Amino acid sequence: MENQLFNNNSVLAWLQYFTDNTDLDLEHVKILDITKKNKNLIPAVEAHRSVLVFTEAGHPDIFYRMYNAGLGECTVVYNEGSEPSGEIKRDKVANMIDRGINASAGMLVLNPSARSTIKFGMDNRSFASGSVKYVGSEIRSVILSKMQINEGKNICVISGESIAIEAAILDGEGDIIAVEYNSNDRNTLEDNVNQFGLNNVTIIDHVDEDTMKELAVPDVAMLVASASMEQEMECLLKINPNIEFVIYTLDFVVAASMPKICDKFGIKDPEIIQITVSKLTSKNTNNTQPAPWLITCKAGE
């Protein structure tokens, strides 16, 4: 078994320490070991009133990044050592932005303003500005729903920057592979990864067996239809013959051709739907967004 900095006994000892010194309700505490791969601290704190965080020494900007994400009013309960004993301290994240973690230990982060609902279909203003033109939040919600995201699912997103970010937030236990062919779009995606404090996103510049061979095997792939779509599908099917696809296109001709393309890869009965979103403006005019086609299908059936 892989050596762990925090095993079950040490986790239980820290839980006991905090329950003895605070009014911690174990029923509502989220346990997060960020010494393990791909653990996202900021989304966890945003979504839970109490997060017991286990971390190794270092992380010089951990509190600054939390503050920068709007979590400055959260309370951190901690001690100065690496053992669950001794004097307990409390401070606001906003007062800790100039310090890091001085010992491998547990700390309790309290967020009374934690949201009680899943952040699903985020407002486009939440994302970093840059070269990317983000899909509307309502349409993104449908795409994410079609992807059937759950904890631990590995996801590949091709040219869908905001989809990759929301998927990473929703799927904190899974690996997200984000493919961006354009260097400016990769930079914007990197800005978003840093802004949201995500550790489970790997950014690559194209899809082939070499770029994918060291990465997690994706369970589902979201693609924006392009000239390279069939090559992308072929590559992903070699990696996972049972992969699920969610494909986005504004082109009716592409949508109409998808049954034939899917049949070429042995994929039967793709579902093809069109989504239309209209908004009534303050001037009582109708603002209709572009109406994409979504194609969903699963290989190996």
Cite the ranges covered by each PLM segment.
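Conserved SAM-binding loop of SAM-dependent methyltransferases across substrates and taxa
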Residues: 161-173
